[in-house]
A protein has these predicted regions:
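A structural motif
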Residues: 28, 106, 111, 208, ...
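Generic structural signal for well-ordered alpha-helices
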Residues: 20-21, 48-52, 99-103, 137-144, ...
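Active-site beta-loop-alpha junctions enriched in small/polar residues
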Residues: 6-10, 34-36, 67-70, 119-121, ...
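Acidic/histidine-rich catalytic cores of soluble enzymes
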Residues: 2, 30-31, 37, 131, ...
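Active-site acidic/histidine proton-transfer and metal-coordination neighborhood
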Residues: 17, 57, 74-183
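A short acidic, helix-capping loop that chelates divalent metal ions and anchors anionic groups
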Residues: 73, 85, 122-127, 193-194, ...
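N-terminal pre-domain/capping segments
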Residues: 1-101, 107, 148, 195, ...
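Conserved, mostly hydrophobic/aromatic
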Residues: 23, 31, 55, 95, ...
Length: 278
């Protein structure tokens, strides 16, 4: 049983060796790298080589790369967003090109997965042209053609919008997106906003190939450490046991004091391990 941390925790800074060493120092074995160019410039070969070296120094495994969702993130301010489900063809193509670059970076880092957002969360007030099913299907097909020859799998993330609930994504995987090497990233916090987390886990079932573990109050996407919000973790983890999930467990957290967040995540890990093995 392996656990990792998303570099989303350090999203506002340029990803460096110290961040990865800090994650490893708290007992984590893996990392998911958040691909925003102001954080990790997946277009820059030297930046990719640098992170590759930092991972080796920290003895961390690159579990996944999170596809870009924004052009930049500085001082708490988000830049223009990317959506592979955008109905405007130029916007869709730009998002696909950025994601394709992140897939190639994942391959270079040895990360077997790239996590994709099916459009833009409703809370971010997407334009009327965004979150189109036909655009999303076309984009995933194009990205699958990039990822499949590299041996990289695409994980469609459960997010709070009309495309991103577990049932809608399963319907796509069993219909318009019946492609090899596709799966789901079960995000517990997003599932909690959408409804019942354990139900989402069971609906996703064997399609789950990645996780984002975080908690909230059921309304705001606050990315809290598990066991600090409203999620019923014993029931949720029982659902994961029921579907036979054996992949990496990734914490996707935020906080102004990363070291403190990691300490709390390490304690949450121990509780999760106890619940999964009891």
């Amino acid at each position: 049983m392996q656990f990792g941390v998303s570099t989303h925790l350090y999203h506002g800074a340029r990803l460096d060796r110290d961040h990865l060493v800090e994650i490893a120092a708290h007992g984590f074995e893996a990392v998911e790298i958040y691909a925003t160019r102001t954080h990790f410039d997946y277009h820059d070969e030297q930046a990719v080589i640098g992170v590759e070296g930092h991972l080796k120094d920290a003895r961390l495994r690159a579990h996944a790369v999170h596809a870009p969702t924004t052009e930049s993130y500085r001082d708490g301010v988000w830049g223009p967003s990317y959506s592979i489900a955008h109905g405007d063809e130029s916007a869709r193509k730009q998002a696909v090109e950025e994601t394709a670059a992140a897939i190639r970076a994942a391959y270079r880092l040895g990360a077997p997965l790239v996590v994709l957002h099916p459009g833009t969360p409703t809370a971010q007030q997407p334009s009327a042209k965004d979150n189109r099913t036909d655009a999303f299907v076309r984009s995933v097909e194009e990205l699958h053609a990039v990822a499949e020859p590299l041996g990289v799998r695409l994980a469609l993330e459960v997010i709070p919008n009309r495309l991103g609930d577990a049932q809608s994504l399963v319907d796509l995987l069993e219909g318009a997106l019946d492609l090899e090497r596709l799966g789901l990233c079960l995000d517990t916090g997003h599932s909690n906003i959408l409804g019942d987390v354990s139900e989402a886990v069971e609906i996703a079932g064997g399609y789950v190939i990645a996780t984002h573990l975080h908690d909230n109050d059921g309304r705001a996407d606050s990315h809290q450490v598990p066991f600090t919000g409203a999620i019923d973790w014993p029931t949720v983890l029982m659902a994961f046991r029921k579907i036979g999930y054996e992949g990496t467990w990734v914490f996707e957290l935020v906080g102004t004091e990363p070291r403190l967040v990691l300490e709390r995540a390490a304690r949450a890990r121990r509780r999760i391990e106890e619940l999964l093995t009891s």
